[in-house]
């Protein structure tokens, strides 16, 4: 059962994309499910630029910028396989057009936490910051090389101060038309990838891993976070991390996620949404297909803040925002040692259920489909394997669950169901709260 289609496909990830470039349509590289809209093709590349390296751990950012400017508009920039590159300067690469970055070697970001807190790129959402911003039109990044965020110094520092600004390893910011992968991503200080204000981007063959070597956990290491982006495809990837495998943040639309192997995560999550009062968060038209999830807190997860201010942690607070979650499908999923097979909540960050019910979410959930989910939970929440908690039936409708064959190690299969129409749930609503 472990050898799902996703696992089988991942055995050949190294062959999934041609290292010489992308002469074919990006749409043809997507499968088995098609993208919501066709992805634009790349134009031919007709020149090559090699990136120099000091080779001694000092900053190579000037060489990278020089090569990008030289080969922009129709070229390929190569990071050699036999070289290691160091980045010690925040790089604005949002000017790119019709260019490839072939990363064959290893790129490491310096562990200068003071510099990066001051100079990393600041984004408005959830205090996100990035080592670099990569954007523009028709940009491909591939080669199978490694980006290393030197995360250990950040894991230890965050344990001392939860308000530090930890950079995201990969910032795809304002990219319209692009392919990312195959690549290895290692030891990100926080999220591995932020995809913001972007469209028509394919992620294919991403290998994510990086755990703490000290007693301080590597926290908030999401694989992907999409934000204000549309027509994004994430496929054929392996993720070993400690937070969401993929998270659809506000205003993510037409997102396809397929053929992933996730381990140690918090699941594939819609949200969190409704965090900021006065903001309108929309996530709609999302398909999650053929996912294997191991040793995780959740498989399929939707997390929405209630209508009252709540605190998830010292650096994560909110509630009262507006918006909607609509037309979300999770299909063909396998779990092993996962706490919740399905978790839907409109009370995110609020432990007092009575208070949540008295202040229901301002953000509606509708037309959600969970199909063909199999496997065994961890047993942590026995006798229940799933939970669907709405803050009010007025803001939560059309949640469907079919062909759900999930049990705990003891054979239990109950669901917690609150303020939800059980007519569409092919599960045992064994308890309510």
Curated annotation (Swiss-Prot):
It catalyses: [(1->4)-alpha-D-galacturonosyl](n) + H2O = alpha-D-galacturonate + [(1->4)-alpha-D-galacturonosyl](n-1). Its EC number is 3.2.1.67. GO terms for biological process: cell wall organization; pectin catabolic process. PbH1 repeats lie at residues 229-250, 252-272, 325-346, 360-403. GO terms for molecular function: galacturan 1,4-alpha-galacturonidase activity; polygalacturonase activity. Residues 43-54 have a biased composition (Polar residues). Keywords: Cell wall biogenesis/degradation, Disulfide bond, Glycoprotein, Glycosidase, Hydrolase, Repeat, Secreted, Signal. Its main location: secreted. InterPro entries: Glyco_hydro_28, PbH1, Pectin_lyas_fold, Pectin_lyase_fold/virulence. GO terms for cellular component: extracellular region. Glycans are attached at residues 46, 127, 197, 251, 263, 290, 295, 327, 352, 362. Residues 30-54 are annotated as: Disordered. It is found in: Secreted. Residues 1-21 form the signal peptide. Disulfide bonds join 245-262, 390-396. The active site is at residues 243, 266. The keyword Ribosomal protein does not apply. It holds the Pfam family Glyco_hydro_28. Belongs to the glycosyl hydrolase 28 family. Specific in hydrolyzing the terminal glycosidic bond of polygalacturonic acid and oligogalacturonates. This is Probable exopolygalacturonase X. The gene is pgaX.
């Amino acid at each position: 059962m472990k050898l799902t289609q996703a696992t089988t496909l991942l055995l050949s990830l190294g062959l999934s994309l041609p290292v010489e470039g992308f002469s074919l349509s990006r749409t043809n590289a997507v499968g088995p499910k098609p993208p919501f809209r066709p992805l634009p093709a790349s134009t031919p590349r007709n020149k090559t630029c090699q990136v120099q390296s000091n080779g001694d751990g000092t900053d190579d950012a000037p060489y990278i910028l020089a090569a990008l400017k030289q080969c922009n508009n129709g070229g390929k920039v190569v990071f050699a396989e036999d070289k290691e590159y160091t980045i010690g300067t925040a790089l604005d690469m949002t000017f790119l057009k019709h260019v490839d970055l072939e990363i064959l070697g290893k790129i490491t970001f310096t562990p200068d936490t003071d510099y990066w807190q001051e100079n990393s790129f600041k984004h408005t959402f959830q205090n996100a910051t990035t080592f670099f911003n990569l954007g523009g039109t028709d940009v491909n990044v591939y080669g199978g090389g490694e980006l290393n965020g030197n995360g250990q110094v950040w894991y230890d520092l965050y344990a001392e101060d939860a308000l530090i600004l930890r950079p995201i390893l990969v910032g795809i910011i304002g990219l319209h038309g692009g392919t990312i992968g195959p690549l290895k991503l290692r030891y990100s200080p926080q999220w591995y990838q932020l995809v913001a204000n972007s469209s028509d981007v394919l992620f294919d063959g991403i290998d994510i891993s990086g755990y703490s070597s000290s007693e301080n956990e590597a926290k908030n290491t999401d694989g992907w976070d999409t934000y204000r982006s549309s027509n994004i495809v994430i496929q054929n990837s392996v993720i070993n991390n400690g937070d969401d495998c993929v998270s659809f943040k506000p205003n993510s639309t037409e997102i396809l996620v397929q053929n992933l192997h996730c381990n140690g995560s918090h699941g594939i999550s819609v949200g969190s949404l409704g965090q900021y009062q006065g903001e309108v968060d929309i996530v709609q038209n999302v398909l999650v297909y053929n996912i294997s999830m191991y040793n995780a807190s959740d498989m399929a997860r939707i997390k929405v803040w209630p209508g009252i201010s709540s605190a998830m942690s010292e650096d994560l607070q909110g509630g009262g925002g507006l918006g909607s979650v609509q037309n979300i499908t999770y299909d063909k999923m396998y779990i092993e040692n996962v706490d919740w097979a399905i978790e839907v909540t409109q009370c995110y960050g609020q432990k007092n259920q009575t208070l949540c019910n008295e202040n229901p979410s301002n953000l509606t959930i509708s037309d959600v489909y969970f199909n063909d989910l199999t496997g065994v939970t961890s047993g942590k929440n026995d006798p229940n394997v799933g939970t669907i908690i709405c803050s009010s039936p007025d803001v939560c409708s059309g949640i469907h669950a079919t062909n759900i064959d999930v049990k705990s190690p003891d054979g239990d299969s109950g669901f917690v169901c609150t303020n939800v129409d059980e007519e569409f749930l092919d599960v045992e609503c064994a308890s309510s709260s």
